[in-house]
Amino acid sequence: MENKVTLSDLVRKNIPVILKGSKHPLTEKELLEELAKKIPELVKNGEYRNGVLRGVLNKLSTQPVDRLGISREGNRVKYYFITDKKTELQNVIRNLISEIKEKELLTVDYLNDSPETIDFIKDVSTHVKDLEGFTR
């Protein structure tokens, strides 16, 4: 019996190869464009077959891609990258900073916040600025 390699299998196998060669995390669209250069079958009638990549990404919990990391920017944009400890730490820091900013937790309310809270917010704000330096 012959084992057929599906297009999804090819995509799953090539995602780490593409991302390892990239100098920065890629969006889904950028990842698809790079994969299509390596796997011509991802383009049909001049259109990207984004459903193939989408299917692979939707099944990550049951069929993981080796060392694939995902980070979010806001609610919409996801970035894909190859992980190592440094990259994972940078993304955890990015996500933390993003959440702090989205929830406006560093905004001081001088009328309602206690002096201790105001001092705490100022201290945290300084540390957040320091942490931002590690994400570059």
UniProtKB/Swiss-Prot annotation:
This is SPbeta prophage-derived uncharacterized protein YonI. The lineage of its organism: Bacteria, Bacillati, Bacillota, Bacilli, Bacillales. The gene is yonI.
